[in-house]
Amino acid sequence: MAESWSGQALQALPATVLGALGALGSEFLREWEAQDMRVTLFKLLLLWLVLSLLGIQLAWGFYGNTVTGLYHRPGLGGQNGSTPDGSTHFPSWEMAANEPLKTHRE
């Protein structure tokens, strides 16, 4: 008699597990549908994030070399290049009238 009881329990186990999973799934769906505005807002924000990242990737593909070229100067000064020749000659309006001209060593 014990064998028939355990055999029936084993046969009923998959149906019980599937019934519990079905109840859990239906409860989850009810909660999901009840939070409709939150779900919609989440989907919109997720879509905005994905589209923004794709736009950045696409723009970098088109303009990446141009942007890199703006910040990279070939020369002896390293990654950003050397100092241009005319950069140390400031116009007189940028210096105070009584201030002496400073050199790089000061």
Swiss-Prot record:
What Gene Ontology cellular-component terms does the record carry?
membrane
PTM-bearing positions, type N-acetylalanine = 2
Polar residues compositional bias, start-end: 81-90
Where do the TM regions start and end? Answer: 9-29, 44-64
Coiled coil (residue ranges): none
* Intrachain disulfide bonds: none
Q: Which residues lie on this side of the membrane: Cytoplasmic?
A: 30-43
The subcellular localization recorded is: Membrane
Membrane topology term: Multi-pass membrane protein
GO biological process terms held by the UniProt record: osteoclast fusion
Q: Does the keyword Acetylation apply?
A: yes
Location of the region described as Disordered in the Swiss-Prot/TrEMBL record: 74-106
Keyword annotations for this protein, in alphabetical order, are:
Acetylation, Membrane, Transmembrane, Transmembrane helix
Q: Tell me the residue ranges located in the Extracellular compartment per UniProt.
A: 2-8, 65-106
Membrane among keywords: yes
Identify its protein family: Belongs to the TCTA family.
Q: What does the function comment of this entry state?
A: May be required for cellular fusion during osteoclastogenesis.
- What protein am I looking at? T-cell leukemia translocation-altered gene protein homolog
What organism does the UniProt record list as the source? Pongo abelii
Its encoding gene is what?
A: TCTA
